[in-house]
Amino acid sequence: MLESTRDHGTQPLDGLLTRWDITNHQLVETSVEQLNHKQVQRARKGRQLTLHLMQKVARTVNDAVLEKIPKDRQPDFKPYTHKHLFNYARDHDPAWPDPNEALMSP
């Protein structure tokens, strides 16, 4: 695989974490699956990840986002999947509207 095909540029994950005001450190601290800072940074910057790691990042993002949402609004949360967070994932839709936009703090 060529080096240029492994770098996909800044990912939708980066914008999502910015909108939710979640830092790399908060994501690592939230992770119960031993996600590390290097993996999070690679995910945000677009370095190609394995499917397993993309799914691990997606689960951790969901956990971190749930911590940001008030308990009474948590049932309205729609979990993110890897295809929402990475533009090189199969079935990624760049026009996908975030169903959790209304849950974000002003």
Where are these regions (language model features)?
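DNA major-groove recognition helix of helix-turn-helix/homeodomain DNA-binding modules
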Residues: 51-71
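Short, charged recognition helix plus adjacent turn
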Residues: 1-3, 7, 21, 66-106
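A short, Lys/Arg-rich alpha-helix, primarily the initiator
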Residues: 1-30
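Residue-level signal for the short linker/turn that defines the boundary of a DNA-recognition helix
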Residues: 11, 22, 35, 49-52
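Recognition helix of helix-turn-helix/homeodomain-like DNA-binding domains
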Residues: 32-49
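DNA-binding alpha-helical recognition surfaces that contact promoter or target DNA
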Residues: 15, 29, 42, 59, ...
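DNA-recognition alpha helix
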Residues: 25-36, 58-65
